[in-house]
Amino acid sequence: LNMLRDSFGRTFPYIRLSITDVCNFKCGYCLPNGYMPNKSDNRKFLHLDEIKRLAKGLSELGVCKIRLTGGEPTVRKDFFEIVKVLKNESGIKKVVITTNGYHLDQKANKIVESGLDGINISIDSLNREIFKSITSHDRLEEILNGIIKLQKLNFNNIKINAVLLKGINSSENDFKD
């Protein structure tokens, strides 16, 4: 089997694939001013057929898991179509995402139906005010409700990511609930 290897001989059974750099949050540690499109920049994001072709090639090189990232991957209008193509037409065995959880409560059913294998949600504080100050969005309750909804739908491969920011959310109390 021809495997994807680096110069040290390490194989890559798993890759992160950024499908957009657009994000709807304005986290100070990432995009403090939010996503600022440059009108003179005519770049385009990978199209669905390009993602499919790339994933097929990666699968043939031994990659069995793809993590979709961004920006915020769910802002793509074809996000769920991308997941379905990766799951059903590429040879990739596991598809997971890293998301900020925006509208997670509204997307929970589609997440389960899409066949997604796992979700990592960035929640930098369980304190509503601190969360809002970091992300510029008052969406913590919506995100937590989305997690509960996913669990009720028996979707249990849910992980939480947090960026610790000294003096902002570095207290253990920011993560108790």
Language-model segment annotations:
Residues 48-67, 75-176:
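Radical SAM/AdoMet-radical enzyme domain recognition
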